[in-house]
Amino acid sequence: MNFYQIKSPLTQITEEKTAGYIGALSEAFGEEFKRVSLEEYLHDDFSLLYVASGGSEGYFIEVFEQLKDKPCIILTSGDSNSLAASMEILSFLKQHGAEGEILHGSVTAIAERIRSLRNAYRAKAALKGKKIGVPGLADAATVV
């Protein structure tokens, strides 16, 4: 599972603390989480945006134009004002007509939600461009 990490340049959050949280989440999910570049994040069909600290919303606004066409699944650890920054980012997304969701809670609950979201995105991608009809009805409509 890929994630793009944003954090305030002023934060004192350590790589060890981030690695500990991401490691616990990887274990609960049953798959390794890999930090990727912004370019990799943008080209991945389904990946997470990890808000590692408060103050990250300023950086997010700087890269928003690149992200606006992709739903933002925002992962928060709850440490270092991560949740507050995530809420600011979600509010910004909503104000600009973009999609987003904050994942917050126990690592087990977050892992389950990620699994559900990824399955939904995979199903949506598999159905993209397909025509689905309802056979047997006199006025069966085709859903595009």
Predicted ranges, named:
Residues 1-144:
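An N-terminal assembly and electron-transfer interface module characteristic of large anaerobic redox
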